[in-house]
Amino acid sequence: MAGAEWKSLEECLEKHLPLPDLQEVKRVLYGKELRKLDLPREAFEAASREDFELQGYAFEAAEEQLRRPRIVHVGLVQNRIPLPANAPVAEQVSALHRRIKAIVEVAAMCGVNIICFQEAWTMPFAFCTREKLPWTEFAESAEDGPTTRFCQKLAKNHDMVVVSPILERDSEHGDVLWNTAVVISNSGAVLGKTRKNHIPRVGDFNESTYYMEGNLGHPVFQTQFGRIAVNICYGRHHPLNWLMYSINGAEIIFNPSATIGALSESLWSIEARNAAIANHCFTCAINRVGTEHFPNEFTSGDGKKAHQDFGYFYGSSYVAAPDGSRTPGLSRSQDGLLVAKLDLNLCQQVNDVWNFKMTGRYEMYARELAEAVKSNYSPTIVKE
């Protein structure tokens, strides 16, 4: 069932399992039970008026003698496009700006310090169509485009770091397009940008028709609230991608995505959680919601009949911790804001227990990978 027929896995489990069984299933699927945040009543009222879901959970670390808790509140935003994909470009962007502004205002009520939007949040995920116009008209400058200026105002007004994934047009280098996330400091300054390292070529994900693999490596951004990185969408399928952000010091890795139920829903709840465990960090998986219909039919060379939609974006955004615990997911069918209170001390505490960094044998893998990428490499296979 890849459509919107059911709201969430959590609701399904709660509806059908007796409480003792439910508690054991959640223990296995989500790790230790998390405390719900006591978010302001006015935040829930505003979310209800604006028709989006609001959830909040706390990840707590053990009390230490020499270090104070390092508390940061993150916000994850998932949403559907408010206007049809055939509406004028400027109207679609303006409608999305208004929608995000309303959600960010609720995030501010909840004390969010860092907020991240979904992949290519200012547009329909139209890369399935392989058409250039009007979709390339959504591309903007990462440094001073209208969406970056919009986010700078939000960041400064709310003392909030904003992670804004957009379709970037790089006018300094031949007007090339990139799938980019802009990181804006809570001061309102553009802290930097990062680009999608892995580009899918599967099913209707025809993204390489528009942009290629990123060229900025694995930057980590030092913010007032902690060190963050952005692993965009398809990069979550690549363990080494997560690893390099972690090696560069990321304490929180955001994964803004646009992925559909028929392809990846069975993988979704596992990948970011596994990355949090393997890399001793927090991970934040974000997915858009709904079905987007395009004016013209398209195909992708996979034998399927021509169609006008990509498939169902199933939301289900969640946060996972280095100890393997995770929040429930947001709805599969509704816009939402997930607020998570993180104690970053948990990263080091879990590291001290499991020692994955110490036992990682990176020098061995670096040596073997350096050999494996050579054209004359021969795999080590022992035969009789």
UniProtKB/Swiss-Prot annotation:
The UniProt entry, under InterPro entries, shows:
Aliph_Amidase/BUP (IPR050345), C-N_Hydrolase (IPR003010), C-N_Hydrolase_sf (IPR036526)
Its annotated compartments are: Cytoplasm
**Which Gene Ontology terms describe the biological processes this protein takes part in?**
beta-alanine biosynthetic process via 3-ureidopropionate; protein homooligomerization; pyrimidine nucleoside catabolic process
- The annotated active site, in chain numbering, is E119, K196, C233
Where the protein is mainly located, per its record? Answer: cytoplasm
Could you state one GO cellular component term attached to this entry?
cytoplasm
Q: In which pathway does it act?
A: Amino-acid biosynthesis; beta-alanine biosynthesis
Question: A single Gene Ontology molecular function, please?
Answer: beta-ureidopropionase activity
Which residues are annotated as modified residue Phosphoserine in the UniProt record?
A: S378
What PANTHER family does this protein's entry cite?
Answer: BETA-UREIDOPROPIONASE, NITRILASE C965.09-RELATED
Role according to the record = Catalyzes a late step in pyrimidine degradation. Converts N-carbamoyl-beta-alanine (3-ureidopropanoate) into beta-alanine, ammonia and carbon dioxide. Likewise, converts N-carbamoyl-beta-aminoisobutyrate (3-ureidoisobutyrate) into beta-aminoisobutyrate, ammonia and carbon dioxide.
Q: What is this protein called?
A: Beta-ureidopropionase
Taxonomy of origin reads:
Eukaryota, Metazoa, Chordata, Craniata, Vertebrata
Provide the gene name from the record.
UPB1
